[in-house]
Amino acid sequence: MKKEIELKFFVDDLDPVRRNLKKMKARFEGSFRESDYFFDTPQNTLKKRKAVLRLRIGDSRHFLTYKENIEKGRFKVSDEYETSFENPKVLLKIFERLGFRVWFHYAKSPREYWRCRNSLITLDSFPFGKFIEIEGGPRRIKFIARKLNLDFSR
């Protein structure tokens, strides 16, 4: 289990963020297509416990993630358990057979992964907007966000 701390920002344009990441000597780790499937029971057991069960299916890698104790304030903080797996179709079938249902699904056009100062920065583009997510310690997140000229009020 790890403690995940993250902050998301809405932006109008990803290009200035990319330029600033390069100026900061951030390391580009790649761009991957991903589809996220969120599961719960018909009784919304996980939602009631403030927990999330997510299957992330990517181009070349797949992850099963369980998050609980999700606190939403300035930073989103949660206990996160994550593991990789090989066969998404089988895992989807297992969840279905266990009585879980997909309550939300979305696909990300290539998600960009960057590393800087022991933090993970992801850039996402959806039909409804562009987002930056920074994961790390609160002070690091704030520092990186300022260097990227991200607006804390959005």
What are these regions (language model features)?
Residues 130:
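Catalytic DNA-binding helix-loop module of base-excision-repair DNA glycosylases/AP lyases
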Residues 139-154:
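Mixed-charge, glycine-accented linear interaction segment located at domain edges/termini
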Residues 123-127:
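A contiguous pocket-lining binding segment that forms or flanks enzyme active sites
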Residues 1-119, 150-154:
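N-terminal strand-loop-strand beta-hairpin
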Residues 10, 137-139:
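Short amphipathic alpha-helical "recognition" segments used for binding
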Residues 46, 121, 140-143:
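C-terminal accessory/tail domains of diverse enzymes
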